[in-house]
């Protein structure tokens, strides 16, 4: 019995050429997957080892950073920071002082509004 012949239960006209059968056998071949599985396992082990090394180095760096006293700033840096703060405060004071209205005049205006609202209540607008 040849491979090109159909199976006994196949309908007529389903004859498969020998070349197609060989190609299908090669395409759907089954082989031992052990080398592939071992290579993936080795790759995963390498990734785990590298991750553990990096994690350990990160932990050690954090510990060293916590153990060291904070860096003292040089007097030049402190002087520059103070100068910046002083300049910003001066700018703020100048801005606020230049925009400060006359308080007596503001109080007088508020009192006039209150008096007018007491003597002349708002007349509700009527719709015509």
UniProtKB/Swiss-Prot annotation:
Topology in the lipid bilayer: Single-pass membrane protein
Protein's GO biological process: bile acid and bile salt transport; bile acid secretion; positive regulation of protein exit from endoplasmic reticulum; positive regulation of protein glycosylation; positive regulation of protein targeting to membrane; regulation of protein stability
Transmembrane segments: 36-56
Residue ranges, Cytoplasmic side: 57-128
Gene induction: Positively regulated via NR1H4/FXR.
Annotated GO CC locations: basolateral plasma membrane; membrane; plasma membrane; protein-containing complex
Expressing tissues: Widely expressed with a high expression in ileum. Expressed in testis, colon, liver, small intestine, kidney, ovary and adrenal gland; and at low levels in heart, lung, brain, pituitary, thyroid gland, uterus, prostate, mammary gland and fat.
Keywords attached to this entry: Cell membrane, Lipid transport, Membrane, Transmembrane, Transmembrane helix, Transport
Catalytic activity, reaction form: taurocholate(out) = taurocholate(in); estrone 3-sulfate(out) = estrone 3-sulfate(in); dehydroepiandrosterone 3-sulfate(out) = dehydroepiandrosterone 3-sulfate(in); tauroursodeoxycholate(out) = tauroursodeoxycholate(in)
Broad class of where this protein is predominantly found: membrane
Protein task: Essential component of the Ost-alpha/Ost-beta complex, a heterodimer that acts as the intestinal basolateral transporter responsible for bile acid export from enterocytes into portal blood. Modulates SLC51A glycosylation, membrane trafficking and stability activities. The Ost-alpha/Ost-beta complex efficiently transports the major species of bile acids (taurocholate). Taurine conjugates are transported more efficiently across the basolateral membrane than glycine-conjugated bile acids.
Domain remark from Swiss-Prot or TrEMBL: The transmembrane domain (TM) is the major site of interaction with SLC51A. The extracellular-membrane interface is absolutely required for transport activity. The intracellular-membrane interface is necessary for establishing the correct membrane orientation that is essential for the heterodimer Ost-alpha/Ost-beta complex formation and transport activity at the cell membrane surface.
Family affiliation: Belongs to the OST-beta family.
Subunit structure: Interacts with SLC51A. The Ost-alpha/Ost-beta complex is a heterodimer composed of alpha (SLC51A) and beta (SLC51B) subunit; induces the transport of SLC51A from the endoplasmic reticulum to the plasma membrane.
Name the record gives this protein: Organic solute transporter subunit beta
Native species: Homo sapiens
């Amino acid at each position: 019995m040849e491979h090109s012949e159909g199976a006994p239960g196949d309908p007529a006209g389903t004859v498969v050429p020998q070349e197609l059968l060989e190609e299908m056998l090669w395409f759907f071949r089954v082989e031992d997957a052990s080398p592939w599985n071992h290579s993936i396992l080795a790759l995963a082990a390498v990734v785990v080892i590298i991750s553990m090394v990096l994690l350990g180095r990160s932990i050690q760096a954090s510990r060293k950073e916590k153990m060291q006293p904070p860096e003292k700033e040089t007097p030049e840096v402190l002087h520059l920071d103070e100068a910046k703060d002083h300049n910003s405060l001066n700018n703020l004071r100048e801005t606020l002082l230049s925009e400060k209205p006359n308080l007596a005049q503001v109080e007088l205006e508020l009192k006039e509004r209150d008096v007018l609202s007491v003597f002349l209540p708002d007349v509700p607008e009527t719709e015509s």
